[in-house]
Amino acid sequence: TDSEGEKNVEVEIFNVNGGNNDIDTSDNTFSGNIFFYPNNMERSILVEGFTGQDCSNCPGGHLTMNSVIENSTENIVEVSHHAGYYPDMYTMKEDGAYLFYYPNPSSTFAPAVMVNRKADQDISSAPVIAIDNKNLKTLITKAAESKPYVSLNLDTKFDDAKRELKIKLQIKPHEQITADSVLFNVFLTQDNIQGPQSNGGSEYIHHHVFRGTVTGNSWGILLTDLT
């Protein structure tokens, strides 16, 4: 097909192994609906890490995450929350809400990670898991197999003089969605921050550090509230 959308596809099997002696042809045809995505659609996977400056095991966890992500062929968006361990100079007010995704929000740990905020029951009952090479690869692979239900086009313009950020969002649904039950948020992250880190020295480079949300809250705003 040369167009996108949900279409009915019919498949017919005949001339199996070069033969034409199928007596019963009543079961040779199958039809069903298949959704065809745009040719230029790019899938992004959200990988959120949990870390802390006082966490001595976190530099090793960062290395494991970096290795898995660098060797992945997927388009990955990485965010590092300074939460799950003791709060530090990079912990933001929104970070505490994301402890909700731990197996036990009152007993958290770091280094930790979650992918697309979804749990894999074969690994853990909760989205957040301890960083492990094999499990992180599995979560990314399964996230890549999931069906995306919308395409997002984000256009940003930053005014250096006014220090103002303007954001234009276009949302194209690929299936029926309920606007009053879907939330939208924009994260601000900062790279290459030099600062102290337990087991990493006084000039450790912190990457993908979560610095807050444009919406001003942890969970975002309803699509119906966007103008």
Locate predicted features.
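Intrinsically disordered, low-complexity Pro/Gly/Ser/Thr-rich segments with frequent PxxP/GP/PP motifs
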Residues: 1-4
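Enriched for extracellular/lumenal, surface-exposed ectodomains of secreted and cell-surface proteins
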Residues: 9-24
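Generic low-polarity alpha-helical segments
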Residues: 9-11, 34, 113, 120
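A short linear-motif detector with a strong N-terminal bias
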Residues: 11, 57-58, 162-167
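Short beta-strand elements
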Residues: 23-43
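Residues that flank catalytic or metal-binding motifs in active/ligand-binding sites
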Residues: 30, 43, 74, 109-111, ...
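Local sequence-structure signature of Cys/Sec-based thiol-disulfide redox active-site neighborhoods
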Residues: 37-82
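Short, conserved sequence motifs used for protein processing/export or organelle targeting and
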Residues: 80-227
